[in-house]
Amino acid sequence: MKYFSILFLLIISYSCQQKKESKIISLTSNQAIKKFEEKLSDAAISIIDPTIEYDPAYFSIPYPNGDVPKNKGVCTDVIIRSYRKLGIDLQKEIHEDMVANFSAYPNLEKWGMTKTDPNIDHRRVPNLEVFFERKGQKLAISQDPSAYKTGEIVTWMINGKLPHIGIVTNKKSKDGKRNLIVHNVGRGQVLEDCLFDYEIVGHYKYVK
């Protein structure tokens, strides 16, 4: 009887320890995700520059880690430059995924694409949307501002024809209801209260 009592206590002790370790691992994982999202917000805020010239022209750029001229850019360059601050090269990641899964990506008629192009593929909003859905997490679209968290990605369709993209930051609007967005819609890389200024068509999270 004494033997079984000792064995029972050992089993209970081991079970409690396992639960404790699992809880610690879970907390550590959540903290890592939160830390990344905050870092992405900080990275986006760090590249704010209203003097950036909005230029959608095609540029031949290095690969990997290529970028258009520093004084130029469009909305997608905000995303690319922010992630690159964290050591993540979306040019390379998107190119590699497109090479392996070209048919999964949109091939809009105006692009006339028959193969991948690392100069421009990652700078197109529809390609970013597909990549974030494939490799990250597609989130619900909502009219509730609290649904859009720090470090998440939002895409819009402006006037029914212009795809747009931005990063949700940890900064709040004056009324405290909405997170501010870093984006570039023609006024440079800026931080604005614009979450619901355009039609939201995509909501994503991509953490590493």
Language model segments and positions:
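Sec-exported extracytoplasmic/periplasmic mature domains
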Residues: I45, D49, I80-I88, H95, ...
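C-terminal motif of bacterial Sec signal peptides marking the signal peptidase cleavage site
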Residues: I12-S15
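Sec-dependent signal peptide recognition
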Residues: K2-L7
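Bacterial signal peptide processing site
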Residues: Q17-K19
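Acidic helix-start/capping segments at beta-turn-to-alpha-helix junctions
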Residues: D55-T76, D89-M113
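...with weaker cross-activation on analogous glycine-rich loops/strands in unrelated enzymes
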Residues: F36-S41, V99-I181
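Low-complexity, Gly/Ser/Thr/Pro-rich intrinsically disordered linker/tail segments
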Residues: G176-K208
